[in-house]
Curated annotation (Swiss-Prot):
<dbReference type="InterPro" id="IPR031309">
    <property type="entry name" value="Ribosomal_uL5_C"/>
</dbReference>
<dbReference type="GO" id="GO:0005840">
    <property type="term" value="C:ribosome"/>
</dbReference>
<keyword id="KW-0689">Ribosomal protein</keyword>
<dbReference type="GO" id="GO:0003735">
    <property type="term" value="F:structural constituent of ribosome"/>
</dbReference>
<comment type="similarity">
    <text>Belongs to the universal ribosomal protein uL5 family.</text>
</comment>
<dbReference type="Pfam" id="PF00673">
    <property type="entry name" value="Ribosomal_L5_C"/>
</dbReference>
<dbReference type="InterPro" id="IPR020929">
    <property type="entry name" value="Ribosomal_uL5_CS"/>
</dbReference>
<dbReference type="InterPro" id="IPR022803">
    <property type="entry name" value="Ribosomal_uL5_dom_sf"/>
</dbReference>
<dbReference type="Pfam" id="PF00281">
    <property type="entry name" value="Ribosomal_L5"/>
</dbReference>
<dbReference type="InterPro" id="IPR002132">
    <property type="entry name" value="Ribosomal_uL5"/>
</dbReference>
<dbReference type="GO" id="GO:0006412">
    <property type="term" value="P:translation"/>
</dbReference>
<keyword id="KW-0694">RNA-binding</keyword>
<dbReference type="GO" id="GO:0000049">
    <property type="term" value="F:tRNA binding"/>
</dbReference>
<protein>
    <recommendedName>
        <fullName>Large ribosomal subunit protein uL5</fullName>
    </recommendedName>
</protein>
<dbReference type="GO" id="GO:1990904">
    <property type="term" value="C:ribonucleoprotein complex"/>
</dbReference>
<comment type="function">
    <text>This is one of the proteins that bind and probably mediate the attachment of the 5S RNA into the large ribosomal subunit, where it forms part of the central protuberance. In the 70S ribosome it contacts protein S13 of the 30S subunit (bridge B1b), connecting the 2 subunits; this bridge is implicated in subunit movement. Contacts the P site tRNA; the 5S rRNA and some of its associated proteins might help stabilize positioning of ribosome-bound tRNAs.</text>
</comment>
<comment type="subunit">
    <text>Part of the 50S ribosomal subunit; part of the 5S rRNA/L5/L18/L25 subcomplex. Contacts the 5S rRNA and the P site tRNA. Forms a bridge to the 30S subunit in the 70S ribosome.</text>
</comment>
Length: 179
């Protein structure tokens, strides 16, 4: 069952009952998924930028945007306009396909995985997940990487509170850790 049909047929009625919504448009939904990676030392290294671009494009199925420094910071040896990170925003079918792969394939591949922290909500129902390595994604092979790099994944929902957002993600299959 795809994420879209599961949401429409199972999750919407369940959340309407749980939170007492009167209209299906009140039920929270996933608006977008943003994948972000800071380059760190790769800001000076063009090869690291290229490999990061290729990795994020493989993982997301969409070419990332290079984020650039707005100001020069001498302490970090960064000049204005230098690449400092990569970002990709997924919506629609790409978002659903990525979430399905993340929940069912990638998260279980994390070493010593006991669930993700239920505390990483921002107060408005959005969830941010930090990953330490890119190898958990099946698209990335060990031989194709030059260095282990992490990334941040933000799941933006239309929920009004963390409680609603947590209920939505739990129903979608996110494996939250029991504290």
């Amino acid at each position: 069952m795809s994420l879209k049909t599961k949401y429409r047929d199972i999750i919407v009625p369940k959340l309407m009952k749980e939170f007492g919504y009167t209209n299906i448009h009140q039920v929270p939904k996933v608006v977008k998924v943003t994948i972000n990676r800071g380059l760190g030392e790769g800001a000076q290294n063009a090869k690291a930028l290229e490999s990061s671009l290729a990795e994020i494009a493989k993982i997301a199925g969409q070419k990332p945007v290079v984020t650039r420094a707005k100001k020069a910071i001498a302490g970090f040896k960064i000049r204005a306009g230098m690449p400092v990170g990569l970002m990709v925003t997924l919506r629609g079918d790409r978002r659903d396909a990525f979430l399905e792969r993340l929940i069912n394939l990638s998260l279980p591949r994390i070493r010593d995985f006991r669930g993700i922290s239920p505390r990483s909500f921002d107060g408005r129902g959005n969830y941010t997940l930090g990953l330490r390595e890119q190898l958990i994604f099946p698209e990335i092979t060990y031989d194709s990487i030059d260095q282990i790099r992490g990334m941040d994944i933000t799941i933006v929902t239309s929920a009004n509170s963390d409680e609603e957002g947590r209920a939505l993600l739990r129903e979608l299959g996110m494996p939250f850790r029991e504290n």
